[in-house]
């Protein structure tokens, strides 16, 4: 299956329309108008170890009185399984929009989550096998895989450590690589006081 040709936001908009009309409405739940984006949550960790998969903001927090739903960019849609995970996160956040975050993850949230096929625990729901099959048939087969690879803020791990060099006389210090230390004269004079000798601290 190919990646969707839609932008990430257009994919989320079309997926939300399908979820709204074909999953939530038949179960008696009305999903309001929402704005959707891929973004880091305002709470929780960011990047590779992020525990915040998505976030829904109340209507009161938006200038136009519309719920804002964000999905973390740390999730990848490059596989069908990854796309299904993004869609079940979207469904979770849409439940919050249904009652404008009034119930948190309480009874009203749980009733809706179980009705559409999400599984416990409620703070970190996942799709049941039945919901995954529904998402695949009704969204993934129509729109393709979600057009996004995961993003991590953790970056590359540092492979070299700079070593501290210090003047025993005046306390001037700096850090440099092992290579630079190996190139220093046996006795290197301090750059700050000219009297002291630099030593590896």
Model-inferred region functions:
Residues 84-101:
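Active-site recognition of the HExxH zinc-binding catalytic motif
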